[in-house]
């Protein structure tokens, strides 16, 4: 961006280009500039990712859409700054509501998954040779030892095949 003058590439222009990229070919542009406003006008303060003098995009019939100047009060801005997410179209994101029964079912599935995983690791621990006096191996230690054991057995088989063929 250093090759372009700063006045040509500022956040207002970039936001305008981003809004234009969301436009559908069947619909008019997402919004119009108010008459007499230049892109370098400092009055184009950003709100919800677009300039204030640019009208909000509302879904509906394209003929019925009228772009109005967004005057908005400060309360909406404060609510959004508190962490409530906003989608590209300016609507608040819906939080997924999980019922008690769904949570219980998910907990049961997770317990079953963990039980099966622990069973598989116990079976692997029994197959991998370890010293009898060692404490129970952790999962990562079991996997690393299994890798070494499999590599050793593979080399042993390959050396036996070479002796038989040669």
Curated annotation (Swiss-Prot):
Alphabetized Gene3D superfamilies for the sequence: Helix-loop-helix DNA-binding domain (4.10.280.10)
Keywords: DNA-binding, Nucleus, Repressor, Transcription, Transcription regulation
One Pfam family in the UniProt entry: HLH
Any GO MF annotation of the entry: DNA-binding transcription repressor activity, RNA polymerase II-specific
Biased composition (Acidic residues): 60-80
The keyword Cell membrane is annotated on this UniProt entry: no
CDD domains attached to this UniProt entry: bHLH_TS_FERD3L_NATO3 (cd11415)
Organism superkingdom: Eukaryota
Record function comment: Transcription factor that binds to the E-box and functions as inhibitor of transcription. DNA binding requires dimerization with an E protein. Inhibits transcription activation by ASCL1/MASH1 by sequestering E proteins.
Protein name: Fer3-like protein
Gene: FERD3L
